[in-house]
Swiss-Prot record:
Organism: Homo sapiens
CDD domains given in the database record: Cadherin_repeat
GO biological process, one term: nervous system development
Parts of the chain on the Cytoplasmic side: 745-962
Lineage, highest ranks first: Eukaryota, Metazoa, Chordata, Craniata, Vertebrata
Topology feature Extracellular, residues: 60-723
InterPro entries: Cadherin-like_dom, Cadherin-like_sf, Cadherin_C, Cadherin_CBD, Cadherin_CS, Cadherin_N, Protocadherin/Cadherin-CA
Keywords carried by this UniProt record: Calcium, Cell adhesion, Cell membrane, Glycoprotein, Membrane, Repeat, Signal, Transmembrane, Transmembrane helix
The protein's role, per its UniProt record: Potential calcium-dependent cell-adhesion protein. May be involved in the establishment and maintenance of specific neuronal connections in the brain.
Name the record gives this protein: Protocadherin gamma-A4
Bilayer topology annotation: Single-pass type I membrane protein
Primary localization class, coarse: membrane
Ranges of compositional bias, category Basic residues: 952-962
KW Transmembrane (keyword) present: yes
Compositional bias annotation for Polar residues: 836-871
């Protein structure tokens, strides 16, 4: 068994900063302290018994000491060495500190085997002011399951200065306190112990107080303040002292507190006036309440001892009625009116006293000065309260008299009025004055005058009296109503509801009453044959303009009005203002299709396209206009429906129908297109047109395809019944046979004409062709009123607008009376000598260039062996045949043929249509393929040969327009 003993010497050994233990550890026995030199037996026995007890108590216990506030990791002691173990054996034997669930102040270094601090240790926090501060910890040896108790003593360091509970202490001391009086001072506190604790106090040097420190039975020191000599508050009211507390550490630490000695006043001083006598002069007319002067007495005491109050001494009734003394401020004010004639001098005794009753006296001498104390008086004897604005200058407004009770210069009075008024003062006799108008008055500038008449004497200072005269200016009707602007503009959308408010017109009249009461009216006039009152009306009282009808922008776009504003004066005055009423366009008109036109029988026109056409080939062009204006009239074209999707495309802005790809043999002869034209209004309006395109490469192909032409597959026809299909097929077969016979006759006639031409005979001219419809319905050829550019480059071009020119419909009564079913021509020889019947030379301006000719995009030569017809006769015959055949094959009726006014063919191959019911838009059209206008075309119809009409007819790819 091992025993560890502490020395018996009461003076414990000092622990070093290295944390060396303050004991020796022995193995196998108990070390006992050496006895004294000559101990007696009793003392020796007591020591042995005590050591035996200590051996049992202190067995397996180690004591260390360490200073507080050391850094973390500071060495406290070497556990391994004290246990007789090597540092590596600590881990092998499982040596560790047993935790008790609280913060550990120490830790075991496993490498060195030393006990170190786990953090900063504050002794004052652990043990407060206890003289001994010891903390215990237990070390477990796991291999032997033994507990080793370790005690660590925390040694105090001087880390806290003395401090006072308050930084400043106020002590009140009476200024008459006797020397030797004691006053307790605040105590300081130092949490350190021993020599590091509070050791004493110091007081800064001063001539009135000293410091005496008393020690109590518990050893605590109590500082006291001792008065050394008499005090005087008036000399020094506050004394500032500094009390310092210090400890005995090294270095010495200290704390301070400010001591404020406030002297309490005693009434040891009487009030004293600043002057033994006060002199003052005052004018007799000084107003009541005027401060005359202020008497002042001072008292150096404080509080009630220094509060001075004032009063009159031996006051007489006369003085108490004329003067008043403020007891607190010492102000003497005028209580009653002073009169120099009554008394010119006053002698007043004034007394000052403090709270306890000490007094002082002084005199106030008042001299009264004579003054101009009477103001002039103004008496109005005659007055006019109103005057008309048309009154002439010099009109009398008032008559008054002035008077002043003073004498001498104080009684001389002069009168005046402001300079900016249209009035003047005229002195008559004595002290009488007249108030007159200086110029003509204008009520619209100033309707009421407040005239101030000032009467002033010549005293020092001068006194004056003001008299106010009120004058009303009566109105006359001298101003007509006026509008803020010389003219007005108003805007109203078309299709407005009846009774809609358009504009509110307001006129101003600076007059008053009936002269300013305004009525509004419109000047009588007519517009488009109707009075203006049928279009608009105006409220005579409010000036609000109303619409009596719904306006139409397409009928008129503006309306000029003249508005009159009249007052109710006598005579009445008036003024006029012009109003321009503009009608704003609304999108209320759908686009109108100009080409192709809609025949009266409901059929659609036929456009021709050769099968050899490449992609981008111009088939036709849709022309439309919109009656609206601006954005509402901007049109765009699009393809709504097509019997062969992807075959055709429509120009968005031009309306040109072009092939989107090259035509193939499998493409049907008849192609049906639905083109929609839409404007850009809000909401947009649109119109649709149905086009029928016949696809063929040559005349034989056309004739061959006509027999096998089938109606295009249309989802809308899926509902036709079987009997309708059979009927249409039967009619088509009969009609095809008729057309075949008719075509043979026409070919024979054509061959005959070619033989005559070959023999060199000069043709007298071919008259205008006359046609009668197949079923007795006339097919009238009508000259274009609107043409579209259909050149090869028209995809990039736009519409060109020409001057309007109507062409009459050409009708031949003779052709109607002939028995020939289709065509009767006059004898060519009979017309040879008639110059009026001679055919005009072909106009080269109407011809297509070689690149524009039909067929394979103008690649064919212009010889007589060409595929397409080379004269007007053949072309007209081909058109009639295609018209009849395509109509019967497609619809079972004359839907493909031309109704009244059209032959149903494209503009490229000479379509004609009537625009009798369409507005005149001819200024928007030019003749395709030509620089000529419609006027030139009209001249051509009259038989006049145009310039350049001697071109080669064989090279023309287009027949001459009729």
């Amino acid at each position: 068994m091992h025993f560890i003993l502490d020395p018996e010497d009461p003076g414990a050994p000092q622990a070093s900063t290295e944390g060396k233990p303050k004991h020796r550890r022995l193995r196998g026995g108990v070390v006992m302290a050496a006895p004294p030199a000559r101990p007696d037996h009793t003392r020796l026995l007591q020591i042995c018994l005590l050591l035996g007890v200590l051996v049992e108590i202190r067995a397996e216990q180690i004591l260390y000491s360490v200073f507080e506030e050391q850094e973390e990791g500071s060495v406290v002691g070497n556990i391994a060495k004290d246990l007789g173990l090597a540092p590596r054996e600590l881990a092998e034997r499982g040596v560790r500190i047993v935790s008790r669930g609280r913060t550990q102040l120490f830790a075991l270094n496993p490498r060195s085997g030393t006990l170190v601090t786990a953090g900063r240790i504050d002794r004052e926090e652990l043990c407060d002011r206890s003289p001994n501060c010891v903390t215990n910890l237990e070390i477990l040896l796991e291999d032997t399951v033994k507990i080793l108790r370790v005690e660590v003593e925390i040694i105090d360091v001087n880390d806290n200065p003395p401090s006072f509970g308050t930084e400043q202490r106020e002590i009140k001391v009476a200024e008459n306190e006797n020397p030797g009086a004691r006053f307790p001072l605040p105590e300081a506190f130092d949490p350190d112990v021993g020599v590091n604790s509070l050791q004493g106090y110091q007081l800064n040097s001063n001539g009135y107080f000293s410091l005496d420190v008393q020690s109590g039975a518990d050893g605590i020191k109590y500082p006291e303040l001792v008065l050394e000599r008499a005090l005087d508050r008036e000399e020094e009211a506050v004394h500032h002292l500094v009390l310092t507390a210090f400890d005995g550490g090294d270095p010495v630490r200290s704390g301070t507190a400010r001591i404020l000695i406030i002297l309490v006043d005693t009434n040891d001083n009487a009030p004293v006036f600043t002057q033994p006598e006060y002199h003052v002069s005052v004018r007799e007319n000084v107003p009541v309440g005027t401060r005359l002067l202020t008497v002042k007495a001072t008292d150096p005491d404080e509080g009630a001892n220094g509060d001075v109050t004032y009063s009159f001494r031996k006051v007489r009734d006369k003085i108490s009625q004329l003067f008043q003394l403020n007891s607190l401020s010492g102000d003497i004010t005028i209580l009653g009116g002073l009169d120099y004639e009554d008394s010119g001098f006053y002698d007043i005794d004034v007394e000052a006293h403090d709270g306890p009753g000490l007094r002082a006296r002084s005199k106030v001498l008042v001299t009264v000065l004579d003054e101009n104390d009477n103001a002039p008086e103004v008496t109005v004897t005659s007055l006019t309260s109103s005057v008309q604005e048309s009154s002439s200058p010099g009109t009398v407004i008032a008559l008054f008299n002035v008077h002043d009770s003073d004498s001498g210069g104080n009684g001389l009075v002069t009168c005046s009025i402001p300079d900016n008024l249209p009035f003047t003062l005229e002195k008559t006799y004595g002290n009488y004055y007249r108030l007159l108008t200086h110029r003509t008055l204008d009520r619209e500038e100033v309707s009421e005058y407040n005239i101030t008449v000032t009467a002033t004497d010549q005293g020092t200072p001068p006194l004056s009296t003001e008299t106010h005269i009120s004058l009303q200016v009566m109105d006359i009707n001298d101003n007509p109503p006026t509008f803020p602007h010389a003219s007005y503009s108003a805007y109203i959308p078309e299709n407005n509801p009846r009774g809609a408010s358009i504009l509110s017109m307001t006129a101003q009249d600076p007059d008053s009453g009936d002269n300013a009461r305004i009525t509004y009216s419109l000047a009588e006039d007519t517009f488009q044959g109707a009075p203006l009152s049928s279009y608009v009306s105006i409220n005579s009282n409010t000036g609000i303009l109303y619409a009596l009808c719904s306006f139409d922008y397409e009928q008129f776009r503006d309306l000029q009005l003249l508005m009159t504003a009249s007052d109710s004066g006598d005579p009445p005055l008036s003024s006029n203002v012009s109003l321009s009423l503009f009608v704003l366009d609304q999108n209320d008109n759908v686009p109108e299709i100009l080409y192709p036109t809609f025949p009266t029988d409901g059929s659609t026109g036929v456009e021709l396209a050769p099968r050899s056409a490449d992609s981008g080939y111009l088939v036709t062009k849709v022309v439309a206009v919109d009656r609206d204006s601006g954005q509402n009239a901007w049109l765009s074209y699009s393809l709504l429906k097509s019997s062969e999707p992807g075959l055709f495309a429509v120009g968005l802005h031009t309306g040109e129908v072009r092939t989107a790809r090259a035509l193939l043999d499998r493409d049907a002869l008849k192609q049906r297109l639905v083109v929609v034209v839409q404007d850009h209004g809000q909401p947009p309006l649109s119109a649709t047109v149905t086009l029928t395109v016949a696809v063929a490469d040559s005349i034989p192909d056309v004739l061959a395809d006509l027999g096998s032409l089938k109606p295009s597959a249309d989802p809308d026809d899926s509902g036709l019944t079987l009997y309708l299909v059979v009927a249409v097929a039967a009619v088509s077969c009969v009609f095809l046979a008729f057309v075949t016979v008719l075509l043979a006759l026409k070919l024979r006639r054509w061959h005959k004409s070619r033989l005559l031409h070959a023999e060199g005979s000069r043709l007298a001219g071919v008259p205008a062709s006359h046609f009668v419809g197949v079923d007795g319905v006339r097919a009238f050829l009508q000259t274009y009123s609107h043409e579209v550019s259909l050149t090869a480059d028209s995809r990039k071009s736009h519409l060109i607008f020409s001057q309007p020119s109507y062409a009459d419909t050409l009708i031949s009564r003779e052709s109607c009376e002939k028995s020939e079913p289709l065509l009767i021509t006059q004898d060519l020889l009979e017309t040879k000598g008639d110059p009026n019947l001679q055919q005009a030379p072909p106009n080269t301006d109407w011809r297509f260039s070689q690149a524009q000719r039909p067929g394979t995009s103008g690649s064919q030569n212009g010889d007589d062996t060409g595929t397409w017809p080379n004269n007007q006769f053949d072309t007209e015959m081909l058109q009639a045949m295609i018209l009849a055949s395509a109509s019967e094959a497609a619809d079972g009726s004359s839907t493909l043929g031309g109704g009244a006014g059209t032959m149903g063919l494209s503009a490229r191959y000479g379509p004609q249509f009537t625009l009798q019911h369409v507005p005149d838009y001819r200024q928007n059209v030019y003749i395709p393929g030509s620089n000529a206008t419609l006027t030139n075309a009209a001249g051509k119809r009259d038989g006049k040969a145009p310039a350049g009409g001697n071109g080669n007819k064989k090279k023309s790819g287009k027949k001459e327009k009729k």
